[in-house]
Amino acid sequence: NILKHTDMKKGDYQAAIREPGLIKVEGWYSTPTVQHCHIENFICTAQMEGERIRMLSSTQIPHIVRRVVGQALGIDWGRVQIIKPYIGGGFGNKQDVLYEPLCAWVCMNLGGHLVKLDVPREETFVSNRVRHAIRSHIVSWVRPDGTFAARKLEAFSDQGAYASHGHSICAKGVGAFPQLYPCDNIEADGYTVFTNKPTAGAMRGYGIPQAMWAVECHTDDVAAKIGMDPIAFRRKNLMPVGFQDEFSKNELYSDTFNQCMDKGMAATDYERKYKEYQNQTGDIRRGIGMSVFWYNTAVWPISLETSSCRMVLNQDG
């Protein structure tokens, strides 16, 4: 049932874990399936105008819809017009071609009359897209001084019944794993797996929220295991200014991680509360924590993304 597998290696993981005195920390971390729950459900209309089919669609990807409708109907793309109005939310769910080809096909088979497909909330949950549930297994080998010697990730992404955006979400998350806390020796494997569940597709963050949840939960586990303050542990291991990822070529240009942590600690009175909330007992307990989040736009080099522009100059330049 494996749709796709991505592996990423840096250094020599097996040799690194033989370093004397290392502390091994491992754990499983899961994120659930989530539906986008945008206010406006999917809706589209189709009507023939001469030899052309004109569609109004609540979509995020009008150009891709045009191509897919043309391919599905076996007609030139130039005979398909997609009009995208302001939509009532999408958050990635409408970044897929959903019902437009069906709506267009019904229209053509009814003599070109106006056809509308208006999907109820129940069908949105079952037959649209959801966020990938991802289960991650992370192993870290840490020195007593709080630095990483080696790290390993295995991530299993629940794709549901159909491919949709497929493995790009899992691959994006796997690609982020070695970036937030750089390490010289890393092994990472990501598996996207078909299941008999609603199809997973794009949703805000595109795999990074699932990855960062796992990484940051694990980071707290590591800090607790070696007896180090979780903020100090993060500051020690976060990507430094000037860091460039070998795979994606992403580069960190400024020290915003530490700046954000400083402001967050000041705003929440973190240090006082962190000490006060230690060693509590009873049914009601208070706690305070902090996590950081690493996200970069687009999915390069997992996938090639393009854009275009048109420039018109006056005679005077």
Regions from the language model: what does each represent?
Residues N1-G317:
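Structural alpha/beta core scaffold segments of enzyme domains
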